């Protein structure tokens, strides 16, 4: 697909006007593999509020004709919740040294257009510009390779992440509960963290 999208960067309190759009997008995209999330826009908006409260956070938004078609988030790990900080602390990495990349969500019709690279480029540049982080990091959902719900044509992001310099960190795993389609609340492993020197 040819896309006439634009990329916008919003920092700290500039994020606030976009919370509802990004919350709705997250609910829509996270219904699919691998999240299978039975989402709630109000919960998502509250979750994203941590980004609006962080003076050094960033939203990278992909837009087409004024509509948000993709979003990628980041904030200093020290500004995130204990659940996100704990694996780093346990792994002897000071949260003050980490700029944490939240999720990237993109409508399926716009995948393969280079937007994922733009999301990483802008978040990495934002973290570097802040000048105080040794690491950029994120996590992703781990599902069993033989999970019968995995789409036959699913292609993971591991190769993309490795090409960008991110590595799994064995032993650094967090557990996050969320409501899964048809299952209710389920405790999920959010995989070994991926880290890269900033």
Which functions belong to the PLM regions below?
Residues 35-64, 73:
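Active-site rim helix/loop that mediates acceptor-substrate recognition in acyltransferases
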Residues 71-104, 148-149, 172-187:
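Conserved acyl-donor/pantetheine-binding loop and adjacent beta-alpha core of acyl/acetyltransferases
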Residues 24-39:
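Helix-loop element at the rim of GNAT/NAT acetyltransferase active sites that forms part
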Residues 21-25, 46-47, 118, 122, ...:
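Alpha-helical elements of Rossmann-like donor-binding domains used by nucleotide-donor carbohydrate transfer enzymes
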Residues 153-159, 164-198:
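C-terminal "cap" of GNAT-fold acetyltransferases
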Residues 106, 112-128:
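Conserved acetyl-CoA-binding loop-helix of GNAT-fold acetyltransferases
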Residues 6-22:
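A short beta-loop-alpha structural element at the N-terminal edge
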Residues 98-101, 120, 127-153:
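Conserved GNAT acetyl-CoA-binding A-motif
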């Amino acid at each position: 697909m040819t896309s006439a999208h634009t990329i916008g960067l919003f920092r700290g309190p500039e994020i606030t006007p976009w919370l509802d759009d990004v919350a709705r997008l997250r609910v829509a995209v996270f219904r699919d593999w691998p999240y299978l999330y039975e989402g709630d826009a109000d919960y998502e908006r509250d979750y994203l509020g941590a980004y609006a409260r962080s003076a050094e956070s960033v939203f990278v938004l992909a837009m087409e004709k004024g509509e948000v078609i993709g979003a990628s988030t980041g904030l200093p790990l020290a500004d995130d919740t204990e659940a996100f900080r704990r694996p780093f602390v346990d792994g002897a990495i000071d949260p003050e040294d980490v700029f944490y990349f939240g999720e990237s969500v993109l409508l399926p019709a716009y995948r393969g257009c280079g937007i994922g690279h733009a999301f990483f480029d802008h978040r990495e540049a934002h973290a570097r510009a802040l000048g105080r982080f040794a690491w950029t990091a994120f996590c992703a959902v781990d599902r069993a390779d033989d999970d019968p719900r995995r789409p036959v044509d699913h292609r993971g992001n591991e190769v993309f992440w490795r090409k960008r310099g991110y590595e799994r960190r064995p032993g650094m795993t967090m557990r996050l509960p969320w409501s899964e389609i048809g299952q209710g609340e389920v405790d999920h492993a959010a995989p070994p963290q991926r880290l890269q020197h900033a």
